[in-house]
C-alpha cells in the first residue's frame, strides 16, 4: 500500500537548495513552504507558553482504505465506502478514542428535535446525488431541477416530499446500509407500501393489516415495508407503539413470575391501560397501538386469521409438541425511524423472514425471554447440575432443530444461520465490488449459536453508519404528549379481516379509493397499428379500480425507473417478421443491455460468453431480429421463489446469486401477433424472457393473442386472469372496489348513456383532424400518373402510382410511405342507413364521453372530448377515421346484440361474442365488413356515437417506396398489388382491399394524404463497392426499383478508374411472363451495368419448368456464399413473411453446403450479418386475395400457433 499521509516539509541543512524552492520559512531547523501545496493555506508560526516556536501541523490526510481480513479464507479486501463523504451522509458512533461502545444495544440517534431546513437540504442533496447516480442521471438537468424544487419546498413549507421512486430507492438503500442485518443480500427485493396519504389511526391499522397479509403470503414470506407520513414540526408525529407488528403479551404475576413474553411486559401494561382486555394466556397476540398526527393512541386487535403461527415439534422427540411452544411466522419491526433524504419517517414497519437462531436461541432460550432451555434439558434427561455436561448447549441445538423442522413442515420461509452467514459473505463480496465497502456490526452479524463454525465469525468488518438508515428512537409512551391527563383511552376495536379490508368501515369513500391505489401498476405497450395501445388503456381502466395504474408507451417510459417498479404489465405487438414496433425498439435494447451488464457483473471479469470464433458479440437488435428467440449462451439462472430460496438451509446458500436488478418487480406479458408469421409474437416472448432472466417475478405465464384466431377473446381472458392474480399477489382480493372491477370485466366499457355526439361550433380542416387523430404530420400529394403493371386481370392487378408532394420531404430508398385511405362509399352509406341517433350525417360534431371524477363532495360527471376522434362530420368519421371493413370485434358484437329488437338476432350475435370457436369460424368464412353484419342481422339499429367509440381506427397502410430522391426529385412512386377476393371459400361476395383499391381508383390530380416512415435497416449501404443480393417476388420488387434508379445516379458520380461499384443481383419471381413487373426497366438497367444479373423464376408459365426464387438461390449458392463471406455483401429480402422464412432457410442450406458451416456457426453468422446491417428484411403479411391463399394461410397460421405453444411449454 502507498503512503496515505503526505507531509509538506523539506529539510535543507546546508541551504543549497533554497533558491530552487518557493519562499520558505524556517521552523526549528526545518524549511517549510509558506503555503501548503495541498491545501494552499499559509503557514503561521505558533509560539508556545515558553516562547518556543512550534512547527505547524501541515499533514494532509488522504482517505485511507480500511484493510479487512478473512482469517479462514486468508484473503482481504479494503473498505473505501466509509470515506466517501461527498456521496454518503454519516453520523457518528458513541465510541471515543479510548472506549469502544459498539456492544451497547442502542445505535446513536439524533433525538426527537425537528431538523432545520438547512440540515434537511444537506442530507437531501447527498441522497438525491445517490438516487440520480443510480439511474445514471447525476448532475443532469433533471437532477439540478429536483434540487431547486426541494430547496423551494423547504423555503415555503419547512419540509418537502420525496417522490415515490425516491422513497422506494431510499427504503431499499436503508436496508442495504443496516449494519446489524445479516440478510441484506435481499435488499433489492423489498415491496414498498407508500401510505403517506394516511391521516388516521384506523387508516394506519388497515394498511398494517394489509402489510401482514401480503408479507405472510401463506408462509412464503415476502419482504415489505409500509411507510406513513414523515415528521414535520415534531408535534404531529405518526407512531407505531408496538416494537413489532406481531408480539406475544407478557404479564407480571403477583408472585413475581411472568406469563408470556418477559420482553413485552411494559408494553402489555400500556395496552391494558389503554383499555385492552387481556386474556392473560401465554400466547396472547398484542393489539396494535397507533397514533396519527400527534393525537393520542388508539388500539386495534389484530384479526386472528391474518396472524400465522408455527406450532413447534421435534423430528425425534415426540414430547416436544406437547409443550405447547409456538411462534409467529412474520418478524415485522415497527419501532424504528427511517431517515432518508433529510426526512424522518417515525412510523414504518418492515419485515424480512426469520433466521432460525432468532427464535431458537434468542426468543425461546434467552434467560430474559421464555427461557425454555432448562425445561428442554430435563425432558432430554440431561444433567443440569453441572456446566461441564454442556446441557445448555445440547438443549439449545435441539430447540433450534425443532424450530427449523417446524417451519419447514409448514412451508414457512426461514433460513438457518449457516446459510445466512454464507449469504452475507456473498453480499460482502458484491458490495465491495459495487461500492467499495459494506458497513457491518460484527457483534450482531455473527449468529448467537455455533459462532466460530460460521464464515462470518472469521471475517473482519468495518462499523460505520451511513444514511439512508433505520434508526432506533425513544418508545412513544415515553415521549408522547397526552391530550388526556391520565393517559388512558377506553375505545376497544376488534375486527375481522373482511371488515378491515372494506375501507369504508373506517373512512370516507374517497379515502378508501386512495388506500386501494397505494400499489402502482405500470402498463407498457408497443404498437404499430394502435391495437396494443387500445388494449393497454383498457387494462389500465380495469386495474384503476384497485391499483395506481399508469399507462405508458414504451418509447415515452423512463427505463431507469423499471428497477423501482412494483408491478409491470406488458402489452406488446410484434412488427414484421419478429421485430419490435418502432416505439418498442429502445425499450428492447435497454432490456438487453441490462441483461448484458448484469451477466458481466456476475462473471466478475467483464467478459461475455456470447459469440465465439471470429464472430462478434451479437447486439440486442440482431438478437431481436434473429430467426428464433435467441438466448445468450450464458443463460441467466432461473430466479428462485422466496420459498425455494429460504425454506431449506441448503437452498438458502445456493440461491444467493439469483438476485437480479428486477428481483422486486412482478410482471406479466401479453403478446400480440399474427400466426401467419413464423416468428409469432416474437417481441412479446423476448420481453417476457428477459424480464424473467433479470430476476423479475412472473406472476402469470406469457399469453399470446393471435390476430387470426380469437385475439380479443384471448386478451379478455388474460386481462381477467392477470387482474385476479395481481389482486391475490398484493392481497387486494377482499377489497370492495376489486369486486366492482371484476364485475366490470365482462361489460361493454361504454354505454349509450355515456357517449354522445355533441354540438361543435367552428370549422375543422380534414387534414388537421387526421393529423390530430393519427399523431402524424401529413403530406398532401397530387397524383400525376396511375397505371397498371404487367398483364391486367380483374382479380390480379398491380398498379404504379406517381405522386407529387405539395411540400418538401425527405426519404431514402427502402423507406415506406404511409397512405391514409378511405372506406368505400357503398359500405359507408349502408352503415349510416342503420344508425338510429343521427339526422344529419354531414354536420360537424364532436364525439364526447362522460367522465366521472371523485371529489371530497361527491362524484362529478362531465362530458369530455373523445381522445381519438376530433370534430368532423359523422360521414367523415365513418369514411376516414374508423375501420368498418375488418370483421367487428367481440366487444362490438356484444353491443350490437343489445341493439337488436329481434331476440333471435340478439342471441346469435351474443353467441358469436362469447364462443371463440364459432366467432373464428364465422370470421374466416364470411370475413364480413360492418355493413354485411348489419345486413345479416336486420333488426340491429346501433347508436352511431357509441359505435364510433367502440370501432378501431382505420389504420394507414404502408408501401415500400419505389422511387429514388436522386432519380425522381419531388416525387414518390408506389408499387401496389391490388387486393380483390371472394369470401366463403370463393363463393361469397367480392371484397376489396381498403387501400389498394383506393390507390387503384385515384385519378390524375386527385389528392392523397401520406407520410414517410423511415426504415433504416433496409437502406442501401454507403459503400458502393459492396455486392447487393436483392430477393423480391411479385410486388416485393417495389423497393428494389428505387434501389437501381438510385444506384444509377450514384454511379454517375464515381471517380473513373478509382471507384468500382459492386455487383447487384436481382432475384424476381412471378406466375408468368405477363406478370414480370418493370421488365423493360430491368433490361435497361442490366444493359447500363446498374444491375449485374437478373434472375426470373416463373411458377406457372406454360411450357417452362416451374421454379421458385429459392431454387434460383440454390443454383447460385457458391457465388452468394462468396459475396457474403469474402466481399461484405448485403442480402435483401422483400415479400410476404412465408416467402422470407423460406428464403432464410434456403440461405442456411447454402452456407452449410458451400461454407461448411455447422448449425451453431450459421446462427452466429446470421447474427453477425444483422449486427453489421448486412441482412435486410422488408416483410408484410400474407395477402388473402383468393380462397386458396386464405385457406393455405390459415393452415400455416395454425401450425405456427401449435409450434409456438410447444415452445412455451
Swiss-Prot record:
Top-rank lineage group of the source organism: Eukaryota
Induction section of the entry: Induced strongly in the fat body by lipopolysaccharide (LPS).
EC code: 1.14.13.39
Cofactor(s) needed for function: heme b; FAD; FMN
Flavodoxin-like domain: residues covered: 521-723
Binding site residues for (6R)-L-erythro-5,6,7,8-tetrahydrobiopterin: 103, 444, 457
GO biological process: nitric oxide biosynthetic process
Residues engaged in binding FMN: 527-531, 669-700
Cofactor: record remark: Binds 1 FAD. Binds 1 FMN.
Residue ranges crossing the lipid bilayer per the database entry: none
Record-listed L-arginine binding positions: 244, 353-354, 358, 363
Catalytic reactions of this protein: 2 L-arginine + 3 NADPH + 4 O2 + H(+) = 2 L-citrulline + 2 nitric oxide + 3 NADP(+) + 4 H2O
Its job: Produces nitric oxide (NO) which is a messenger molecule with diverse functions throughout the body. Involved in the induction of immune gene expression.
Listed name of the protein: Nitric oxide synthase
Species whose genome carries this gene: Bombyx mori
